[in-house]
Curated annotation (Swiss-Prot):
Active site: 109 (schiff-base intermediate with dxp)
Subcellular location: Cytoplasm
One Gene Ontology cellular component: cytoplasm
Cited Pfam families: ThiG
This protein's pathway: Cofactor biosynthesis; thiamine diphosphate biosynthesis
Quaternary structure and partners: Homotetramer. Forms heterodimers with either ThiH or ThiS.
UniProt organism field: Cupriavidus necator (strain ATCC 17699 / DSM 428 / KCTC 22496 / NCIMB 10442 / H16 / Stanier 337) (Ralstonia eutropha)
Entry keyword set: Cytoplasm, Schiff base, Thiamine biosynthesis, Transferase
Gene3D superfamilies from the UniProt entry: Aldolase class I
Principal subcellular localization: cytoplasm
Gene Ontology MF term list: thiazole synthase activity
Protein name: Thiazole synthase
Length: 278
């Protein structure tokens, strides 16, 4: 069957039984202005936009956050609240409950931070907190590492999608452990995996989509770019290109060269010299 780019439109991105038209999720913090954020969302048309209930100094905070929230609602993009800044299970649960009431959604991006320097998730307590939130009716998307055992444990407690990092939050380094990330994808073929944290360039996003990851979540890479709106658009294009490449079935890597032009049809003297060199 001939593959056409338009077939990506028939390749739904499904989370907890809901289909989304984009495989890009976009954070809403650290933009130069509310207008820039709004334009970036319009340029990238993400599946969801993430919002931290506990954020400090967020755009619109000077107006009590009301103007900011009204702007987000006007964008007509589903909101994914997160528990950024939470270091204990109780903080996460309290924040999630408040977010569900404020944003009127059962979706929650679970962030339980274990170290305030690396912002690495608390992998020991993360599964238990995820299980508690799921029992409370939340659709949990847990921020985690690429550790396969941890990811399996999160699935065991009821998570239907995972958000492993590529690198520590805000570093922009891309996938620092590509082997582990590719193994994770291979070992969990039926689990939606969204790369969260560490991506800095559109090429980073395209790469993980080429590996078979289902989506990416971005914030700093867009918000702190010299031209955030252009970067948002570039990431959206990279995500689509990466997914299209994955579906197209990339050629396997080889250790040795292999001529792309066949010997058949070449002048006989060239074919003879080629055979002699072989």
């Amino acid at each position: 069957m001939t593959f056409e780019p338009s077939e990506t439109l028939r390749d739904p991105f499904v989370l907890y039984g809901e289909s989304f038209g984009s495989r890009l999720l976009l954070g809403t913090a650290r933009y130069p202005s509310p207008a820039t954020l709004e334009a970036a969302v319009q340029a990238s048309r993400p599946a969801m936009i993430t919002v931290a209930l506990r954020r400090q100094g967020a755009v619109g905070a000077g107006e009590g956050g009301q103007a900011f929230w009204q702007m987000l609602k006007a964008l007509d993009v589903p909101v994914l609240p997160n528990t950024a800044g939470c270091f204990t299970a109780q903080e996460v649960i309290t924040t999630a409950m408040m977010a569900r009431e404020v944003f009127e959604t059962p979706w929650i991006k679970l962030e339980l931070i274990g170290d305030d320097y690396t912002l690495q998730p608390d992998t020991l307590n993360l599964p238990a907190v995820a299980e508690t939130l799921i029992k409370e009716g939340f659709k949990v998307l847990p921020y985690c590492t690429e550790d396969l055992v941890l990811c399996r444990r999160l699935l065991d407690v009821g998570c239907q999608a995972l958000m492993p990092w590529a690198a520590p939050i805000g570093t922009g380094r891309g996938a620092v452990n590509p082997h582990a990330m590719r193994v994770l994808r291979e070992r969990l073929p039926d689990t939606p995996l969204i790369v969260d944290a560490g991506l800095g360039l559109p090429s980073h996003a395209a790469q993980v989509l080429e590996w078979g990851y289902d989506g990416v979540l971005l914030n700093t890479a867009v918000a702190q770019a010299a031209y955030p709106v252009n970067m948002a658009r570039a990431f959206a294009q990279a995500v689509e290109a990466g997914r299209t490449a994955y579906l197209a079935g990339p050629m396997p890597e080889r250790e040795v060269a292999q001529a792309s032009t066949p010997v058949v049809g070449m002048p006989f003297w060239h074919a003879d010299s080629t055979e002699q060199r072989a």
